[in-house]
Every structure is written in structure tokens, then in C-alpha cells.
């Protein structure tokens, strides 16, 4: 699916966080539960992820937001004690029950982690490697995709004359943008972001946030953030997670503006106001 595909609402309406019609649910989660060994960390989570929108997941540390994010492209498979139950419906397939090619899935649903994690390779190789891994053999095609991804994250003008240097010499903010470019180079349909600004200084954090805003409407983004102001600035939809009887649960989900201004649940209101959390 092309990232240029038109969304059913205008960019202006997206920026206001209020779609002009009900957007398409690209991914549906129903009754999701996650356990590690005997410990249940997440239970009874149901929500829709809407195409072309940014969905922010908020709530205190330890309430299951990152575990939830990791289920969406099956990264929980890497934890031998993880058990995931429920349904995750994507493109007519239940990702938890049907046979899934996880390599292809992670091309379609990319992940950006909390701390920048560039490979200890050149800038160019950081972006070329995933393309080769996913079967892009033509060098000109790889160059075009790499150039576009670096332009998308605002790095091209900064690094185009030194693509052969180690990615590890870049600043923290540049490294995080490179990691985002590494995901975008595969043209995913959904981009998962686990606190992408939390390890960055305020200036770098602002640059990454501006990048996220530029992605809105072109990509479907799910972002975990503890920065409530950031969630309110960037998101169309928001979900509030909370610990109930030592298990993380989704307390409230809806349009971001509504959740922040007129929350339906007293726990949501208390957390947003700073009275709880």
C-alpha cells in the first residue's frame, strides 16, 4: 500500500484532531491480554487504530503501554515467557491466530524504540541493510528510497555529503531520526513509537516531534508518551492506560481533544489534571 494513498479527511482536519468522517480502522484489537510467565501485565484491551491518524497511548509507567505496542507487530515473540491472548485484526488476518510471516509483518508495521539504536555501521548501511534484507536488489531503487527516507526525516541536507561515516557519531536527535528513516525506508503502513523523545534533549525532542507531525496523514502512527502536552499536540486519538488490581487496562479511548477536555472517566480526568499518577 502506498504511503501516498489519500486519507478520507483533509490534512487541516487531521491537524485539528477531528476527522470530517469516521476514518477507516486499519487495525482492530479485541480483548487483548498479555502475560509474562504467571504475571498478567495487560488485560481486556479493545481499540481501533485508524488509518492516517496518530494515536497516543498515555498513562503511568508499568501499566502495559509498551507491552501493548509490542504485540502489534509480534515483537512479544522474542520473549519466551510471553503469552498473548485476544485478537489483533490487520488486513483481514488475525495476527495472533493465523499463520504470520513476521518479517513481512514488521516491514508493514515498523517500530521505533525509546533510545536511538542505530547499527554500528555507516549512515548509508543503516538504511541499505533493511532494504537488502527485504529483497530490494536494485541499487538505484535502494538509493532512491534511502534519499527519500532521509528527506522525510529532515536528515538529507545534514548528512548527504557524509553517508559513509559511522551512524554512531551523529547526535542523539540525529540518531533517532535515522532510526525513524530506517523504518520509513521500508514504507510501512503503521509506525509504532515507544517514547521516541524521552531520551533526547529538549531541542532534539522538538525536532522529532515536528517530524511526527509531518508524518501525520501519510502514515498511521501509534506513539507511547508520558508527555501529555506532546500527546495533545500531535495525536488525533488517545488511549489512557491504568493499573487496576495490579493489571494494566485501557480505561478510556477516543478522540484526543475530547479525552483531554471532557474525559468520560474520573481516573482519566485525575491523571490529566495531575491529581493522580
Curated annotation (Swiss-Prot):
Catalytic activity: phosphate(out) + ATP + H2O = ADP + 2 phosphate(in) + H(+)
Protein's UniProt keywords contain Isomerase: no
Keyword annotations from UniProtKB, A to Z: ATP-binding, Cell inner membrane, Cell membrane, Membrane, Nucleotide-binding, Phosphate transport, Translocase, Transport
Entry's localization field: Cell inner membrane
Amino acids binding ATP: 59-66
UniProt xrefs under PANTHER family: ABC TRANSPORTER I FAMILY MEMBER 17
Name of the protein: Phosphate import ATP-binding protein PstB 1
Origin species: Nitrosococcus oceani (strain ATCC 19707 / BCRC 17464 / JCM 30415 / NCIMB 11848 / C-107)
Taxonomic placement: Bacteria, Pseudomonadati, Pseudomonadota, Gammaproteobacteria, Chromatiales
Gene for this chain: pstB1
Amino acid at each position: 500500500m502506498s504511503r501516498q494513498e489519500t486519507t478520507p479527511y483533509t490534512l487541516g482536519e487531521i491537524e485539528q484532531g477531528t476527522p470530517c468522517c469516521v476514518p477507516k480502522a486499519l487495525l482492530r484489537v479485541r480483548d487483548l491480554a498479555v502475560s509474562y510467565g504467571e504475571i498478567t501485565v495487560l488485560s481486556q484491551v479493545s481499540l481501533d487504530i485508524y488509518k492516517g491518524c496518530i494515536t497516543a497511548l498515555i498513562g503511568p509507567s508499568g501499566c502495559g503501554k509498551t507491552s501493548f505496542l509490542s504485540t502489534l507487530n509480534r515483537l512479544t515473540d522474542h520473549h519466551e515467557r510471553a503469552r498473548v491472548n485476544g485478537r489483533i485484526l490487520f488486513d483481514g488476518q488475525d495476527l495472533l491466530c493465523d499463520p504470520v510471516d513476521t518479517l513481512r509483518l514488521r516491514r508493514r508495521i515498523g517500530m521505533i524504540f525509546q533510545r536511538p539504536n542505530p547499527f554500528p555501521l555507516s549512515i548509508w548501511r543503516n538504511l541499505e541493510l533493511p532494504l537488502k534484507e527485504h529483497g530490494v536488489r536494485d541499487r538505484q531503487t535502494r538509493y532512491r528510497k534511502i534519499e527519500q527516507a532521509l528527506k522525510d526525516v529532515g536528515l538529507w541536507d545534514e548528512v548527504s555529503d557524509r553517508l559513509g561515516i559511522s551512524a554512531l557519531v551523529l547526535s542523539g536527535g540525529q540518531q533517532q531520526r535515522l532510526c525513524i528513516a530506517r523504518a520509513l525506508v521500508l514504507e510501512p503502513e503503521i509506525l509504532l513509537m515507544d517514547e521516541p523523545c524521552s531520551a533526547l534533549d529538549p531541542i532534539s525532542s522538538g525536532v522529532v516531534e515536528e517530524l511526527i507531525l509531518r508524518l501525520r496523514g501519510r502514515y498511521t502512527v501509534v506513539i507511547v508518551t508520558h508527555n501529555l502536552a506532546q500527546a495533545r499536540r500531535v495525536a488525533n486519538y488517545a488511549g489512557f492506560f491504568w493499573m487496576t488490581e495490579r493489571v494494566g487496562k485501557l480505561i478510556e479511548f477516543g478522540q484526543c481533544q475530547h479525552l483531554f477536555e471532557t474525559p468520560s472517566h474520573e481516573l482519566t480526568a485525575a491523571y490529566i489534571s495531575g491529581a493522580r499518577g
